[in-house]
Amino acid sequence: MLKFIKSIFKTPSDRIIANLKSKIQQVHSAESSLAKLSNIELRNKTNEFKARLANNEPIDNIQYEAFAVVREAAKRTIGIQHYDEQLIGGILLHQGKVIEMSTGEGKTLVATLPSYLNALIGKGVHVVTVNDYLAQRDSDWMGTIHRFLDITVGCITSNTNEHARKIAYNSDITYITNNELGFDFLRDNMQFTNQSKVQRGCNYAIIDEIDSILIDEARTPLIISGPVSDNTSLYPIINKLITKLNKDDYEMDEKLRNVTLTDSGINKLETMLAEINILAPNSNSLYDFENMHLIHYINQSLKAHTLFRRNVDYLVKNGKVIIIDEFTGRTMDSRRYSEGLHQALEAKEKVEIQNENQTLASITFQNYFRMYTKLSGMTGTAMTEATELKEIYDLDVVTVPTHNPVQRIDYNDEIYSTKKDKYSAIIQLIQECYSKGQPVLVGTVSIEKSEELSKLLHSKKIPHNVLNAKHHDKEASIIAQAGRIKAITIATNMAGRGTDIMLGGNAEMLVDQSNLTEEEYQEKLKITKMQIEQEKEQVINAGGLFVIGTERHESRRIDNQLRGRCGRQGDPGQTKFFLSLEDDLMRIFASDRVTKILRTIGLKDGEAIHHPLINRSLATAQQKIEAQNYEIRKNLLKYDNVMNDQRKVIYEQRNEAISSDNVNEILHNLTEELIVETVHKFIPPKSYKEDWNIHELLKEYHHIFNVKLQPASIEATSSSSEVIEYLTKTALDIYKQQEQDYSAKSANEAIKHIFIKTLDQTWKEHLYTLDHLKQGISLRAYGQKDPLNEYKREAFDLFKQMLLHLKYLFIQRVARLHIDLASSPKSTSSLLETSDNNLKGKIITENSMAHKYFGKISRNQLCPCNSGKKFKHCHGALK
């Protein structure tokens, strides 16, 4: 019935595809004449296209001809020709859409079409992948086509040095991971010269596995941080106390991933803290003001012990706690949990505790990728997230039909009462498949589960491979051979995604080329391919690849991705999920009513059940979790949008200063603004002269400009505007004197450097303040206030304060500028290094100036600059 209804009422994707099929003929028509061209003549088509675009011909006018050129080049270079469905995918990508193409349908090849076409403009194309292996593989493989057509290709991985990065970004097409792309953007906005930057803007990006990058990773912002000198000695002490608590001492909510102490837990901790003299003197309550800082350590340690599991949420490797990505199952070596949670985990695992970090720069993938002029992407599973992709990124999703009909069989779920029964059934099915030579891919949700299943297979003496975050270096080679006869592969979540599982195996990966001549390699490859073809027939006869899911994921999309690992390009395949009432999804999210019904039915040991009610309950649970995660991502975006608007202002000012040959305009404008604000503070406009606070005005002016003026000079004026004019002229005279002392060029370079350093310092402090504001803002809801509106309002006020503080510090530093030109024969620009250590002796640092001009001040006193901050966090900050 459903198929009949679908045949009558076409989906939006069906209508779009039907419209594009007629346009594919234009590609075929253009291609007929290209086959006769020599390689050089075909390559020259690139120059022809560039010339036509330079003459303002619309890019869409050359689209089909350009696609035909790429198709012909692919046939001549890698021996593969785009089929019609891939051409349709290429058109949709060029239109800035997300295409859903099944596994094995050649998404990598599809991307060559729009990437070539858009590279002709000369502004760069970024082909974004999820890991270094895929970026390098696609660059080498697909780059052959582009280089043949005289299009430059670059590749950036985590090991690429700065010089090579710049060359790669300046290439026509750059293959790169999403993390490298985002971090390079942040790093570029921390550089001191345009020459030090590596990127050249955001023109057009094609994102492979777009759902993984824009949906799964959207909750985790990219952060560049630096260590702060917080004391970490409390973490192991608190950790030891937390281990002495029992389950009655805290309440845990696994749905919300939250844990709180009960009264008994608080009482126990207060007693233990008092015994080891951690509580403040004359205090016996954890919630006394003097002890409030301990709550942070306790909460994080409690989370570490109750909500975070080793080999599920993180693993310990080489004495370090490394986060495991919950969606990909891969390790995130360069990332750390914030707010002391990572330190709590390090204390729990008894490894070296590293200092907490302070954010220096951050951005979410949501805001980063929205900077691109044009954005498109491809994946095997996007329709379940079509609403989010449209609402947040304004991207439409279109399903591209498969080249061959799908022959995969998806069996109903089997549900068992216990995990033990479930694993027994899985092992039995694996044994059956193994005995007839059918390859099996088993998907697990964590390292812990994959190793548990591996032990069971070892006990049955069934040979197998395990692919998880501990063995990620072998990922591509293991997954590529998962389609061989009797191959049993256990993989976490999305491990190996992006690498096709070929029935019979992958010949190129089986033949080691390192010790062979080209002739020997080709001969061995030919023999291996023949063997694989024979093996493929045996695998097909056995039923193709059998994919087993050991439990349902929180997201339906992840389940669909696992199913999609088999049945590529019309190959046969089978999938089945095995569940138990002890699975996290069933235990935490499935309704109590369903569990009660199953208990009432009374499942016997080893007995499975197929029940529509349970399937509906699971689907409902998954939809609820997906909706909850979507709300989290939307909420994160709302908060990040506040910071993003401020980030744009700061980065714009920074780039303007870096690009400027003369920063005098910035200096003079800020000086005039500050003097107006300062004068109006002590001499309000239209006020009587006897109300003027001349003494405090001159005291403030001295703090800023290091110039002592006599009261008579102000008393001689008749209005606040005259005072402003006089004080502004005095300040500008200081700057003129600096130009005479050091030359205009030297002074300009020094002032530019001071502005950028001061901007970076105040922005870093502002990010720190915003982090703390965000942590506690949700509590405003208890006061009947909208936390988001409160955050927007306070963040804006803080931003205004930051800009005022920036102005004050910058002008104060410039007024005290001293360049020691005699210390080195180098140019002034070479004297102005980015590090504070190199800065000392060249430009007087803020810390030394603060003590010189403010006198002896306690570090905990308010700073005399009127910023409202403590002296130690302002002019007395340690450099």
UniProtKB/Swiss-Prot annotation:
Protein name: Protein translocase subunit SecA
Catalytic activities: ATP + H2O + cellular proteinSide 1 = ADP + phosphate + cellular proteinSide 2
Subunit structure: Monomer and homodimer. Part of the essential Sec protein translocation apparatus which comprises SecA, SecYEG and auxiliary proteins SecDF-YajC and YidC.
InterPro entries named among the record's database cross-references: Helicase_ATP-bd, Helicase_C-like, P-loop_NTPase, SEC_C_motif, SecA, SecA_CS, SecA_DEAD, SecA_motor_DEAD
Cofactor(s) this protein requires: Zn(2+)
A GO biological-process term: protein targeting
Domain of life: Bacteria
Family membership: Belongs to the SecA family.
Residues the entry annotates as binding Zn(2+): C863, C865, C874, H875
Localization terms from the record: Cell inner membrane; Cytoplasm
Main location, first listed in the record: membrane
Amino acids binding ATP: Q86, G104, E105, G106, K107, T108, D500
Membrane topology term: Peripheral membrane protein
Pfam family, one: SecA_PP_bind
Record SMART domains: SecA_DEAD, SecA_PP_bind
Entry note: cofactor: May bind 1 zinc ion per subunit.
Species the sequence originates in: Orientia tsutsugamushi (strain Ikeda) (Rickettsia tsutsugamushi)
Functional summary from the UniProt entry: Part of the Sec protein translocase complex. Interacts with the SecYEG preprotein conducting channel. Has a central role in coupling the hydrolysis of ATP to the transfer of proteins into and across the cell membrane, serving both as a receptor for the preprotein-SecB complex and as an ATP-driven molecular motor driving the stepwise translocation of polypeptide chains across the membrane.
Keyword Cytoplasm: yes
Keyword check for Cell membrane: yes
